[in-house]
Amino acid sequence: MFYLLNVEKNNIINILFNGYNNLKKRPKLGDFLILENKDSLLLTRVEEENYFLDYNDLKNEILKFMEIGFDKLGELEKEELYRLTYKVIPLTTLSKKERKITGSYRNIPLHLETTIRKPSFEEMLYFLNYEYLKDEFKDFNKFKEFLEENKINENNIKEKEKELLKIFNGEIISYYQNLPVIFNVNKFLAKRTGVFARTGYGKSNAIKIILLKILKLAYFKAFSDKEIKNALIVVYDVNGEYAFTNQQNTGFQEVFKDKEDDFLVLTNKRESYVFVRPLKINFAELSTNEIAEILINAFGEEIKAYTYFEEIDNKIWKNLFALAVSKVKDESKKEEKDFEKKEVEKVSDFIIKYLRKLLQIISSELKFIFEEKLKEMEKEGKFNVVKVVIDLEKEVKLSEELQKKLKKAALQEVNIGAIEWRLKKLLYNLYHPNGLSSNDVKNLIENKKMVILDLSSADDWSGNIISRYFTKKIFEYNQEFFLKNEKYHVILTFEEAQNLLDDINKNNDIFVRVAKEGRKFNIALIAITQQPSSISQKILSQMDNFLAFHLLNEDDINALSKANNHYSGLIKFLLKYEPIKGQCFFYSAPEQPFVIQMKFNLFDDELEKFKKEMEELKKKEKEEEQKLFQDAII
């Protein structure tokens, strides 16, 4: 039925298929074939299909068939019409001697020694998931024996999932032609992952499932590295798909119904859940150096006033905010966590008003008088920046000498105005007393399981500033943990990643730093994009995991193929011309030797499984607590 023809220089193998009496066994594009000899099984994939006859001979046979009819053709003529050739590419090798996959392909298959056939159910399951087999089952014979003993076959595979998982280090993440595809989501820790797809083809569903599997690891304490103290998932949610459940969408709030302390959503939507905080920054808890850096990122240039702004002591800055918040609380009769736009703007106006006066003072010779007055007040057990500013202002009005000193201030009206409008815009749009602070970020890394930044609830400008600030603090804290030999993993999941990772040369850009250096500090990156061609090739080519769904743009497909040669040939063709929702072409370095085509389950179905598993875990924990209690009594 199959015959080996030849092997081309680029290792493409040409096979002849005599199809007249075997049409049901005719392989399709993308199917796997095995080339077997006395030493090994070589797994190959069908890349191309052609007629065996050349064009002119085929044309003559077809004309003859049209003239006299198919029934009157001789057997040999019929066979000639149904002879097909296939180009197949080698993927990996199973050594019969070692009874395990070697991954290498060095020898040309010999015509007389090679049998060509479709793989069996056991062989295909073994080839697809070899990387995740437990050591004792990496021997193919033992693997087969286990399947036979447990009566696992292609007809009952879905019913036998629990038994099957006993031999794998991983989870069933998807299926390929009714065969389970195993994946160990530990591989997402401290790794770079690229997810590529047009809108509507299942990338969000796939990512939700992967994140759910990571959460399962966290709750079952099943990380491969037992030194991991915590793993925090952070989602930069551009389209508002991950947090809340509504008619169109199931959010992660369903996962944390009984574990709300592990979950945080930062959003500007009016939600009353206990796990919700505003998508804002509490600038009172930031140093003036940090705020100056945010201002530079937000407005793109450094101005003279920033130098003097950074000289403002953190104690002074905090006191200014405390006075502003206290005043607005008294006026509004609201707690600061309940402040709305009107209250935030009043606090901001108060800050700006006295910041103007402060900058004039500290950029002049009055700075020393101001500092002495603060010290005197502090000795009395008090600290009120505004009172000192007002008192000094009164003294200046009564003293020509002090007025002259103030006029010599380095910052004049125009300089102060430049920082004033910038800071005002920043505070109006991004400040809230219940917003994030630096210490909050550290606490999240140490204690939370998932944080979602609902960027759909903010404009692009505000969302970008908060995302950069949050990412920078994570990077800095994980650097600290690394130096202390403490292992806290963070998985940063970015939608619209092409807007963040377009230029590898932006060395000071925090997103590029995460992509280049994050792995060292246990920061994983999941970059989701519709436009892989817009991401720097230097970043794209360094991805460890690739999940590619349907892409239409030629530049995007070529960029992916250039970054990872496994996405060439037939895979490249299918990415463009098979727009099947949920179909994914998955590759993971370094152990997985070829792209696996698969279709993800639905997130809602996986969520139901997760809930049942969590109920079982809760029941087990309760039984253990009762046992400990009984033992203590005895």
Where are these regions (language model features)?
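Pre-Walker A adenine-sensing motif
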Residues: 176-186, 440-441
